[in-house]
Amino acid sequence: MMKYLLVEDERFAYEEMKRMMEKLRPDYQLEAWTATVEQTVQFLKHHPVDLMLLDIRLTDGNSFDIFEQIQVTTPVIFTTAYDEHAIQAFKVNSVDYLLKPVEEDDLLAALRKFE
């Protein structure tokens, strides 16, 4: 069973991503939901996952800060409302870069790339 971490600071966006993942990949297990850089770093230090769905702008910083604090080898599907981070995203384990609001078809295509 694939385990994933959902990193999102907006509850509505979290609920929507979770709903789409449950529909598209019911066999994937949500290990945790984190909303900050600090929560994510602490979680990843102790809990390996197979995939991360990672919002770029978080309440306590930029999600790229995570990669500066710990070594992350987990594949990442980035989500953001902004497109200026695309180049940076592909330098750190990026499977795909999805603009919000994330469309189900786009998430499905990203999951297929991951698999």
Where are these regions (language model features)?
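Short, flexible, glycine/charge-rich loop motifs used to bind or transfer phosphoryl groups or to couple energy/partner
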Residues: M21, Q42-F43, D65-F67
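Extreme N-terminal starter segment of soluble prokaryotic enzymes
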Residues: M1-Y4
